[in-house]
Design a protein with these regions (language model features):
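Surface-exposed, charge/polar-rich loops and edge strands
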Residues: 1-158
Length: 158
């Protein structure tokens, strides 16, 4: 299971849905993240079904926000959004999200805290921007939050 999805118990998902939050499935086969700045993330297998692609496009077109749960979800959606719209897509993604590439399919991200200079941190910067990300990490250090796969999660919502 992707680590960002661990807190999503049946009870939490039920509560979110009861409050009108829409959830959309994506199939992910996650890899092991490398903390090294010079190492790109490994290719990861994914599948974005047509219903999910349509829902993401509809939510964004009507002014809603798409919040990804985990960095692999971002990679999958961004891979499926090469035309500016998210389309049904499946395969392996090697897409690297950076401040230079930006994001087209997500507005926010629930994720763990990632190591400095990692490719995951570049993705977080692309989504949240440097000021918000700096503030988030300073607070995490000050409060003693735990890092990465078995650590604490945060919501990045610029």
């Amino acid at each position: 299971m992707p680590s960002a999805g661990r807190p999503f118990t049946t009870a939490l998902v039920t509560e979110l849905v009861s409050r009108g939050i829409l959830l959309a499935p994506i199939t992910l086969h996650t890899g092991v993240a490398s903390p090294e700045a010079h190492e790109p993330p490994y290719a990861e297998r994914y599948a974005v079904p047509g219903t999910t692609a349509s829902l993401v496009d509809h939510v964004r077109a009507t002014g809603g926000r798409v919040i990804a749960v985990g960095t692999t979800v971002v990679r999958a959606l961004e891979t499926a959004a090469t035309s500016g719209r998210v389309v049904a897509s499946a395969g392996f993604t090697e897409h690297l999200v950076t401040p230079d590439t930006g994001v087209r399919a997500v507005d926010g991200l629930i994720t763990g805290l990632h190591e400095p200079r990692s490719t995951h941190l570049m993705m977080l910067t692309a989504i949240a921007g440097t000021p918000l990300l700096t503030q988030t990490y300073e607070a995490a250090l000050e409060e003693g939050y735990l890092w990465h796969e078995f650590g604490d999660l945060n919501l990045l919502l610029p």
